[in-house]
């Protein structure tokens, strides 16, 4: 793992908030919340961890944090981000097409809230979701059953009950199976549960409050007490703070600037709920004032992209040319856009959050940049170079016993990974398992298109391998006419532990030994690990694609269209394998005879 947790934790706030763990490609692995961010994040990097957490931590390349005022706000934001970004470690690596739903039948007089693996095409009810995970569905179902006493039994059980079950005894069901509740009253509970699941719990609370007052005036104190308990449970659930105000769409921009860099944080609020923060590190090449820089950034942010413009844009500073910017935004949006920097109430709280997040992100980025500069300088000194390199490239090969061989090229400059310059190469025409030939093909394809004067030529080319790979890399550069690029080979030690690598320079007889605490070695390990992860991710995608399609491709009569329909209908090849003949025949374009053919081909 190349992520420097010790260094990162020095920059983290003790405030409550939400954190996002990212992999080498910038994909969100996990979203979590914490009452104290620093303590929670530190717990991932000390002590015994379970297998799942160890697997997660091993893939971390970056952690982004968003500060909130309270833990409740962090919880609300966490759920928003999980539903929006669907990180794999929050959803237990579920396939994209099989996110769970909550289903409410419109055919049953007393419908249950049902767990469904996927949305069915027939219109026999209402689907709520999708939810980010099975756990999220089950927790939501449990909560709605507890508050509104919705039944959770199967229809077949419901039809044959003659007395209430245990769920009624523990006040988690109103026993509609034995007519302890009328159809109209039960439907009202269902409607309230649906409204809560759709995020309209405030409307439910208001209605229940009116019902409670009516019951009290009618001297029905038992009903009033029941409604009071429901209201209290809902209010404990809500605890609405500034992250979920229930009012307004707005984007909020704040700028933090210090010697060495600046950060602009953009908070998006929709329907009163904060959807998250994005951080930008623009270059102030013209040395503009903060007001002018923020104005130019906002203009480019909206007018330079096809982006939704909310009714209100709030800024921490009065913008230069604010009237012009407001007019342009209004014209682009086709409605009047309010541009404000002096705000009160929850808008002022939003703004303070944006300012806090900008400061926090800038602190982290400047610390990272300083550390990276030390690593580049250390590598320069270790390799005895006259100048500090400005660009590194590293290659790695990944395959499974020669299957689906993929080469990766990752790029670092003095600000860190340059992910827009990353490349993958699907290797073809080489013997299975021949890593030398695969590396030669990847290097040739990469550098034959570059000229000696190209600004994207690396100062140092790193290959994951020993003497053989280094020799081959030198031959490729000579063949394509590239000079001036230094070569570095990284051979894993016998135990394959970090810090025990053998490094080879330029010629195979020139080895380099670096202390395990060397910042230069840490840089090499970082880019090597990044190349490895980028390669293995591409390899797995390629391998899975080949395996997924080849199984169905071998079945007579199954072309690309039917193959797509099968995979879409069942959420993947595993679902197709588990389907019965009758279930296969329900797929559009699959006849009963074809279903039998598919079933026999998959099961023999």
Swiss-Prot record:
Source organism phylogeny: Bacteria, Pseudomonadati, Pseudomonadota, Gammaproteobacteria, Oceanospirillales
Protein name: UvrABC system protein C
Function: The UvrABC repair system catalyzes the recognition and processing of DNA lesions. UvrC both incises the 5' and 3' sides of the lesion. The N-terminal half is responsible for the 3' incision and the C-terminal half is responsible for the 5' incision.
Primary localisation category: cytoplasm
An annotated GO cellular component: cytoplasm
Keywords: Cytoplasm, DNA damage, DNA excision, DNA repair, Excision nuclease, SOS response
Taxonomic source organism: Chromohalobacter salexigens (strain ATCC BAA-138 / DSM 3043 / CIP 106854 / NCIMB 13768 / 1H11)
Recorded family membership: Belongs to the UvrC family.
Gene that this polypeptide is encoded by: uvrC
Protein's UniProt keywords contain Lipoprotein: no
Residue stretches making up the GIY-YIG domain: 14-91
């Amino acid at each position: 793992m190349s992520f420097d947790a010790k260094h990162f934790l020095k920059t983290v706030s003790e405030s409550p908030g939400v954190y996002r763990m990212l992999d080498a490609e910038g994909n969100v692995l996990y979203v979590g919340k914490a009452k104290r961010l620093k303590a929670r994040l530190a717990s991932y990097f000390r002590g015994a961890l379970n297998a799942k957490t160890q697997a997660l931590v091993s893939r971390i390349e970056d952690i982004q944090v968003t500060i909130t005022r309270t833990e409740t706000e962090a919880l609300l934001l966490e759920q928003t981000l999980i539903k929006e970004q669907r990180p794999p470690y929050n959803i237990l690596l579920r396939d994209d097409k099989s996110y769970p739903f909550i289903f409410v039948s419109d055919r049953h007089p007393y419908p249950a809230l049902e767990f469904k693996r996927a949305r069915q095409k027939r219109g026999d009810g209402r689907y709520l979701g999708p939810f980010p995970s099975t756990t999220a569905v089950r927790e939501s179902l449990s909560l709605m059953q507890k508050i509104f006493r919705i039944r959770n039994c199967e229809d077949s059980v419901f039809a044959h009950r003659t007395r209430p079950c245990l769920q009624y005894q523990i006040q988690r069901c109103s026993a509609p199976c034995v007519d302890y509740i009328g159809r109209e009253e039960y439907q009202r509970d269902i409607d309230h549960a649906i409204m809560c699941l759709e995020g309209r719990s405030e409307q439910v609370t208001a209605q229940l409050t009116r019902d409670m007052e009516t019951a009290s005036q009618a001297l029905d104190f038992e009903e009033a007490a029941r409604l009071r308990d429901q209201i209290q449970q809902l209010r404990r659930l809500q605890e609405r703070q500034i992250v979920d105000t229930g009012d307004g769409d707005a984007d909020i921009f704040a700028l933090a600037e210090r010697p060495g860099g600046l950060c602009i944080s953009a908070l998006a609020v929709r329907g009163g709920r904060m959807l998250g923060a994005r951080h930008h590190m623009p270059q102030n090449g013209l040395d503009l004032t903060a007001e002018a820089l923020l104005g130019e950034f906002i203009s480019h942010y909206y007018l330079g992209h096809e982006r939704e413009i909310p009714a209100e844009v709030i800024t921490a500073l009065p913008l230069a040319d604010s009237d012009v910017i407001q007019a342009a935004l209004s014209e682009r949006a086709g409605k009047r856009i309010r541009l404000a920097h002096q705000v009160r109430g929850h808008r002022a709280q939003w703004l303070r959050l944006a300012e806090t997040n900008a400061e926090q992100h800038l602190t982290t980025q400047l610390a990272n940049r300083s550390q990276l500069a030390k690593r580049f300088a250390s590598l320069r000194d270790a390799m005895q170079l006259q100048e500090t390199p400005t660009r590194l490239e590293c290659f790695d090969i990944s395959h499974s016993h020669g299957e689906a061989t993929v080469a990766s090229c990752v790029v670092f400059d003095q600000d860190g990974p340059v992910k827009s310059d990353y490349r993958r190469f699907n290797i073809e025409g080489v013997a299975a398992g021949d890593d030398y030939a695969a590396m030669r093909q990847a290097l040739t394809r990469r550098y034959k298109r570059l000229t000696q004067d190209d600004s994207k030529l690396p100062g140092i080319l790193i290959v994951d391998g020993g003497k053989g790979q280094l020799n081959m890399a030198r031959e490729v550069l000579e063949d394509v006419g590239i000079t001036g690029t230094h070569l570095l080979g990284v051979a894993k030690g016998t135990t394959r532990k970090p810090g025990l690598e053998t490094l080879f320079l330029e010629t195979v007889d020139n080895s380099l030994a670096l202390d395990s605490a060397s910042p230069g070695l840490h840089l090499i390990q970082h880019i090597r690990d990044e190349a490895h992860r980028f390669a293995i991710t591409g390899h797995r995608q390629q391998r899975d694609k080949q395996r997924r399609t080849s199984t169905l491709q071998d079945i007579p009569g199954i072309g690309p269209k039917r193959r797509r329909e099968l995979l879409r209908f069942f959420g993947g090849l595993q679902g197709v394998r588990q389907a019965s003949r009758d279930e296969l025949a329900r797929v559009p374009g699959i006849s009963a005879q074809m279903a039998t053919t598919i079933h026999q081909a998959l099961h023999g």
